[in-house]
């Protein structure tokens, strides 16, 4: 398994429009029609979505919250998106306290670029359970450097991988133990590729961006054929 990761820091000053459809999920406490509780066949998927919500929160807040279990979720589907409203239990290792946490994780569409199949995943909310509204508007254009909104970068050539190690970093096993989010990113690639790629060797490019709105994050995952 190999992947390239691009990251962009938060950008301040983006315009915030009116809150929309996602406000409903929180106003009803995630308990409106269609509630799902474990165990279910999608348990693995929901667990990954919940962990990415926690990762986004930890990254933005500088915390180290850990996933305990997901409690319930429901789904809202549109023509170009699938939003998952997830309530989970999170733990703060510094005081061993367990508390309720909510995240909205969205499949925001996919497209083909050259030989890549790219899926756009988004975190649209991630916070300890509360009653505040959700800002669903994700601005990929005005708030971000154009370098991060254009085409996904190309996979490095064999020559570059062999002779130009300044362009990449080889992840060590110790890195995986110290940064569990790397494993979550890797699992998201496997989740995406299981229906797209049949080869046993997998390559992926991951681009993480943020639009400056608290609790927002985008992950674009390109499967390299």
UniProtKB/Swiss-Prot annotation:
It comes from Arabidopsis thaliana (Mouse-ear cress). PANTHER family: (RAPE) HYPOTHETICAL PROTEIN (PTHR31260:SF74), CYSTATIN/MONELLIN SUPERFAMILY PROTEIN (PTHR31260). Pfam families: protein_MS5 (PF04776). Belongs to the UPF0725 (EMB2204) family. The lineage of its organism: Eukaryota, Viridiplantae, Streptophyta, Embryophyta, Tracheophyta. This is UPF0725 protein At5g63820. InterPro entries: MS5. Coiled coil: none annotated.
